């Protein structure tokens, strides 16, 4: 790594630490030429390929925005939405791919959102899965009921 002070082409890593729940690596570096120290931050870039074919960087902020819209008027606090977005990011990063289709990001949102708030889940799923009729909603509600009964043991 080039020194930002004297432009010497090499530096020595003095210390490395994880940051942002393991999503970043902060490295403290020292320049052998001028002796000054500086910090670098490394992050693995995750790209999302949209339906149109356009690629853009993964954005936890976009996840939070979409989930907030689905949760509008529901008793869901901001911390729960932020935690859901973190879980989604961890899930998609765990796949190990540098690029993934937006469809997979949507799937990663649906599970945690269903656990957080079923009405918000229905709202999100209706847009994500392009519900076109009342029958689509009825099918999804029946799926939710069946899952709830299975959890309750009856």
Swiss-Prot record:
Coiled coil: none annotated. Binds 1 zinc ion. Pfam families: ATP-cone, Zn_ribbon_NrdR. It comes from Salinispora tropica (strain ATCC BAA-916 / DSM 44818 / JCM 13857 / NBRC 105044 / CNB-440). The keyword Nucleotidyltransferase does not apply. A zinc finger (unnamed) spans 3-34. Negatively regulates transcription of bacterial ribonucleotide reductase nrd genes and operons by binding to NrdR-boxes. Belongs to the NrdR family. HAMAP family: NrdR. Keywords: ATP-binding, DNA-binding, Metal-binding, Nucleotide-binding, Repressor, Transcription, Transcription regulation, Zinc, Zinc-finger. Its cofactor is Zn(2+). Residues 46-136 form the ATP-cone domain. Signal peptide: none annotated. One of its GO terms (biological process) is negative regulation of DNA-templated transcription. This is Transcriptional repressor NrdR.
């Amino acid at each position: 790594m080039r020194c930002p002070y004297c432009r010497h082409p090499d530096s020595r890593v003095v210390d490395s630490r994880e940051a942002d729940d393991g999503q970043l690596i902060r490295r403290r570096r020292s320049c052998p030429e001028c002796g000054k120290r500086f910090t670098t931050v490394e992050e693995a870039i995750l790209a999302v390929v949209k339906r149109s074919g356009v690629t853009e960087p993964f954005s936890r902020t976009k996840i939070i925005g979409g989930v907030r819209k689905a949760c509008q008027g529901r008793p869901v606090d901001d911390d729960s939405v932020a935690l859901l977005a973190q879980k989604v990011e961890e899930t998609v990063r765990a796949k190990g791919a540098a690029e993934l289709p937006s469809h997979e990001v949507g799937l990663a949102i649906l599970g945690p959102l269903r656990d957080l708030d079923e009405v918000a889940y229905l709202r999100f799923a209706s847009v994500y899965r392009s519900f076109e009729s009342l029958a689509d909603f009825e099918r999804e509600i029946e799926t939710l009921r069946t899952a709830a009964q299975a959890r309750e043991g009856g």
